[in-house]
Regions:
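A short-motif feature that recognizes glycine-rich, charge-decorated loops
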Residues: 1-163
Length: 163
């Protein structure tokens, strides 16, 4: 075997080994991904309940592709705002910890600042984290850290978009 052929073969083996290692690392990283808050598709959610601290509970239901507030006389809600709340189900979790690792009062979960219930699955929102723009969210017996972007706001309030 010529020297040039042997060098190309060694180079090819090194490239194949690097590709195998990169594939293994990507698969390992994907398995370690914390996932989302809930295993619900935001588009399939049909019932939302929102309780903000100091406010009465608001109930919403999706009918014929539009959101309706069902407290008292049913009235149309702002679809975009309710879609934002439904999107919270798919919020990317930065990290999960057992609820037993925290004192609920110290992270704003005794009582929670907001309770968002999506198709019967409650999400309890606490204080912002001191480590960055994140919120503590209790989901069952676990606490998640999620972006502040997913902090529930009242869908009844109109907002102005800045351009």
């Amino acid at each position: 075997m010529k020297r040039a052929t042997r060098q190309r073969l060694i180079l090819l083996l090194v490239v194949v080994a690097l590709l195998v290692l990169a594939g293994w690392q990507l698969r390992r990283d994907a398995q370690g991904e914390p996932g989302t808050l809930l295993a619900l598709d935001p588009h399939s959610i049909s019932h939302i309940t929102l309780t903000l601290s100091g406010s009465p509970t608001m109930h919403y239901e999706k009918r014929d592709g539009h959101w309706w507030r069902t407290d008292g006389t049913p009235e149309r809600a702002i679809d975009g705002r309710l879609a934002e709340l439904a999107d919270t189900a798919a919020a990317r979790v930065l990290s999960w910890r057992p609820a037993s690792d925290f004192d609920p009062a110290k992270i704003g979960l005794a009582p929670p600042q907001a309770i968002l219930t999506l198709d019967g699955q409650p999400l309890e929102f606490g204080e912002s984290s001191v480590t960055g723009p994140q919120h503590f969210v209790r989901v069952g017996q676990r606490i998640a850290l999620v972006s502040l972007h997913y902090t529930p706001r009242s869908p009844a309030l109109k907002t102005t978009e800045l351009h």
